[in-house]
């Protein structure tokens, strides 16, 4: 394969994703001639980076972040004419998508197990113009989860989402 874009959310999970940047890049270099890394800084960055990867015909996108980051990436490629392969490393608080896909929840283990030679198709959903890869909910629960700050997620992990 020719090129891959790594999309890393540095505020996901325990804010430790950047600690694995070099290891991810080295793993990707075993499979790809060109490895480009993008670091998100604000909402919609992952969507914009994924759209760029699709527009520029990247062979694959690897997202390292939580469910929100993965959903942003899915939104960035879902309606494009060309859709690159998608790999996910669990770096968030809940990592529900990677759990459903039975991806190793240990970051080092997930990186070690990355295999770009095989793919699986997954279903995605869309509501009000927003794509999602795992769960759709309405009402006070998603609002409460959305309002949990990065600091609380870092400090309390999944317990911060208990409301």
Can you say where each PLM-predicted feature lies in the sequence?
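Positions that flank functional sites
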Residues: 43, 68, 113
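Short Gly/Thr/Asp-enriched flexible loops that form oxyanion-binding sites at enzyme active sites
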Residues: 68-84
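Catalytic core of DAGKc-family lipid kinases
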Residues: 31, 79-163
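Helix N-cap/beta->alpha junction signal
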Residues: 42, 65-66, 137
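ATP/NTP phosphate-donor binding region
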Residues: 1-61, 71, 75
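Glycine-rich beta-strand-to-loop/alpha-helix junction loops that act as flexible
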Residues: 10, 64-66, 89-91
């Amino acid at each position: 394969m020719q090129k891959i874009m790594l999309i890393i959310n540095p505020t996901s999970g325990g804010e430790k994703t950047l600690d694995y940047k070099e290891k991810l890049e080295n793993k990707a270099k075993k499979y790809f001639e060109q490895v480009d890394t993008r670091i998100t800084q604000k909402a919609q960055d992952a969507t914009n980076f994924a759209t760029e990867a699709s527009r520029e015909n990247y062979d694959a996108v690897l997202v390292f972040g939580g469910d929100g980051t993965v959903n942003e990436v899915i939104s960035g490629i879902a309606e494009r004419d060309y859709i690159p392969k998608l790999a996910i490393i669990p770096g968030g608080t809940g990592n529900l998508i990677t759990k459903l896909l039975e991806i190793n929840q240990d970051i080092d283990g997930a990186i070690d197990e990355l295999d770009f030679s095989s793919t699986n198709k997954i279903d995605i959903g869309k509501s009000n113009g927003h794509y999602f890869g795992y769960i759709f909910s309405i009402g006070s629960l998603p609002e409460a989860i959305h309002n949990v700050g990065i600091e609380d997620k870092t400090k309390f992990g999944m317990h911060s989402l208990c409301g």
